[in-house]
Amino acid sequence: MGLFFSKISSFMFPNIECRTLMLGLDGAGKTTILYKLKLNETVNTIPTIGFNVETVTFQKITLTVWDVGGQKKIRALWKYYFPNTTTLVFVVDSSDIERIPEAKEELFSLLAEPELADSHLLVFANKQDMPNARSPAELTQLLDLGSLKNREWFICGTNAHSGQGLYEGLMWVKKQMKT
C-alpha cells in the first residue's frame, strides 16, 4: 500500500530538474560548497583545473551542478557550459575586498551572455566567518545587483565549511523553479 502512494506521489509531484552552473573567481569556495551540498562534509580541495559535476537532490529538486574553475586562464572556457543553464550560482569571497571589482566585472560579463539570459542568479556571499567579510547587503551594493531589473536574483551570506546559508539559497532556487 505504501508503494502505491509513493508511486502516486512521485507521479503527481515529480522531481524538478535544474541544470546549475556554479562560477566565480578562483579561491571563492565553489568546490567546497559543491561537496558540502553533495556530501554534507567539508572536503580538502585543490584549485579546480577544468570542472567538477555532481548531482544534488534537495526537497524534490535535482540539481546537476557544474563547478567550473575560476582561474583567469580558465574563465574563457566558461561559455562552453552555458547551454541549458537554469540557475547561475556566482560565488564571491566576501572577505577579499580587493577582488570584488574583478568579481563584479566577471559577473556582469556573464549576465550579458544571451545563453544565460533566462537563468536565475543566486549569489553566495561566501566566507562570512572571516573577520573582514562584507555582508550580503554590502555586496549587493559593491556588485551593483540592484541594477539588475530583468532578472530574478538573490544573495545570501554563506560559510561553505559550516553550511550556513547554503540551504537558504537552495530554497530560493526551489521557489524559482516552481514559478
Curated annotation (Swiss-Prot):
Superkingdom to which the source organism belongs: Eukaryota
Gene Ontology biological-process entries: endoplasmic reticulum unfolded protein response; intracellular protein transport; IRE1-mediated unfolded protein response; vesicle-mediated transport
Reaction(s) catalysed (UniProt annotation): GTP + H2O = GDP + phosphate + H(+)
Residue segments, region Important for the stable binding to the membranes: 3-16
Molecular-function annotations in GO: GTP binding; GTPase activity
Pfam families for this protein: Arf
Membrane topology: Lipid-anchor
Entry keyword set: ER-Golgi transport, Golgi apparatus, GTP-binding, Hydrolase, Lipoprotein, Membrane, Myristate, Nucleotide-binding, Protein transport, Transport
Transport as UniProt keyword: yes
InterPro entries linked to this entry: P-loop_NTPase, Small_GTP-bd, Small_GTPase_ARF, Small_GTPase_ARF/SAR
Keyword Signal: no
Protein EC: 3.6.5.2
Lipid-carrying residues in chain (N-myristoyl glycine): 2
Protein localization: Golgi apparatus membrane
Binding-site residues, GTP: 24-32, 126-129, 160
Primary site of residence: Golgi
Family: Belongs to the small GTPase superfamily. Arf family.
Function of the molecule: Small GTPase involved in protein trafficking between different compartments. Modulates vesicle budding and uncoating within the Golgi complex. In its GTP-bound form, triggers the recruitment of coatomer proteins to the Golgi membrane. The hydrolysis of ARF1-bound GTP, which is mediated by ARFGAPs proteins, is required for dissociation of coat proteins from Golgi membranes and vesicles.
Protein name: ADP-ribosylation factor 1-like 1
Lineage, broadest ranks: Eukaryota, Metazoa, Ecdysozoa, Nematoda, Chromadorea
Gene coding for it: arf-1.1
